[in-house]
């Protein structure tokens, strides 16, 4: 389901309730970020749906709260701490003309932080 650009805990809770109310069978939620996933966990618990026994949930971005929520959220760690300084450095180099790099794809490694919301 689409949340638009509202990627908050509240949006995750509302969208999950809409999905439950739709009657469409599902057994997992892959959320765009951890906040949406935490909202989903809240709504699943409020509806008596057991995680991970009846429903598995995974987020993306490994925010600090994910480890402390009950149950602790399985998430993807995108390892992107380096991206902002790299982007700023490339932009400043281009502005002052010291080094103009050709456009390129920059890739990163991501990995699963398995916690209690999936059966991995």
Which positions does each model-derived feature cover?
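Short acidic active-site motifs
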Residues: 11, 15
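Short beta-strand elements in bilobed, periplasmic/extracellular small-molecule ligand-binding domains
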Residues: 1-10
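Flexible loop/turn connectors
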Residues: 17-120
